[in-house]
């Protein structure tokens, strides 16, 4: 069996309100998370909502990291999806924790693109 991608979904509860509404800080966190997992950054795009909240995505050569925040609930939802053997999505978590300071994190692991090895055309 071969796995084409590794995908983690993060549920981040009890985060710092100010961090969840800090668009430049979230952009920096995304860049730091990309570096931490060994991925290749293509670009970062974020949007600040009124009155609060930020959504953002780091587009990677290997896929993406995304975030959507609810400061009023102290909650953030994140996806880290990577392809390739050299990238480790779980390595993003310390950078995310350092910035958002969640009280609780739920991590769901998804193996993407499971195929039989003999199906892979080299």
Swiss-Prot record:
Major enzyme class: lyase
Name of protein: S-adenosylmethionine decarboxylase proenzyme
Subunit comment: Heterotetramer of two alpha and two beta chains arranged as a dimer of alpha/beta heterodimers.
Bilayer-crossing regions: none
GO MF, one example: adenosylmethionine decarboxylase activity
Coiled coil: none
Pfam families reported in the protein's UniProt record: AdoMet_dc
Active-site positions on this chain: 63 (schiff-base intermediate with substrate), 68 (proton acceptor), 83 (proton donor)
Record-marked site positions (Cleavage (non-hydrolytic)): 62-63
Pathway the protein takes part in: Amine and polyamine biosynthesis; S-adenosylmethioninamine biosynthesis; S-adenosylmethioninamine from S-adenosyl-L-methionine: step 1/1
Matching InterPro entries: AdoMetDC_C, AdoMetDC_fam_prok, AdoMetDC_N, S-AdoMet_deCO2ase_core, S-AdoMet_deCOase_pro-enz
Pyruvic acid (Ser): residues bearing it: 63
UniProt cross-references to HAMAP family, sorted A to Z: AdoMetDC_1
Cofactor: how and how many bound: Binds 1 pyruvoyl group covalently per subunit.
EC number: 4.1.1.50
Organism the protein comes from: Methanococcus maripaludis (strain C5 / ATCC BAA-1333)
Catalytic activity as recorded in UniProt: S-adenosyl-L-methionine + H(+) = S-adenosyl 3-(methylsulfanyl)propylamine + CO2
One term under GO cellular component: cytosol
Cofactor(s) needed: pyruvate
Alphabetical GO biological process terms: spermidine biosynthetic process
PTM section of the record: Is synthesized initially as an inactive proenzyme. Formation of the active enzyme involves a self-maturation process in which the active site pyruvoyl group is generated from an internal serine residue via an autocatalytic post-translational modification. Two non-identical subunits are generated from the proenzyme in this reaction, and the pyruvate is formed at the N-terminus of the alpha chain, which is derived from the carboxyl end of the proenzyme.
Keywords from the UniProt entry: Autocatalytic cleavage, Decarboxylase, Lyase, Polyamine biosynthesis, Pyruvate, S-adenosyl-L-methionine, Schiff base, Spermidine biosynthesis, Zymogen
Domain of life: Archaea
Similarity comment text for this entry: Belongs to the prokaryotic AdoMetDC family. Type 1 subfamily.
Function according to Swiss-Prot or TrEMBL: Catalyzes the decarboxylation of S-adenosylmethionine to S-adenosylmethioninamine (dcAdoMet), the propylamine donor required for the synthesis of the polyamines spermine and spermidine from the diamine putrescine.
Gene3D superfamilies noted in UniProt: 3.30.160.750, S-adenosylmethionine decarboxylase domain
């Amino acid at each position: 069996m071969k796995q084409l991608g590794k995908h983690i979904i993060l549920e981040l509860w009890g985060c710092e309100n100010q961090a969840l509404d800090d668009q430049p800080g979230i952009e920096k966190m995304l860049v730091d998370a990309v570096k931490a997992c060994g991925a290749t950054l293509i670009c970062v795009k974020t949007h600040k909502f009124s009155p609060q909240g930020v959504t953002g995505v780091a587009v990677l050569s290997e896929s993406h990291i995304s975030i959507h925040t609810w400061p009023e609930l102290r909650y953030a939802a994140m996806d880290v999806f990577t392809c390739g053997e050299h990238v480790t999505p779980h390595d993003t978590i310390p950078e995310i924790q350092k910035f958002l300071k969640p009280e609780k994190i739920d991590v769901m692991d998804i193996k993407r693109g499971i195929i039989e090895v003999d199906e892979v055309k080299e």
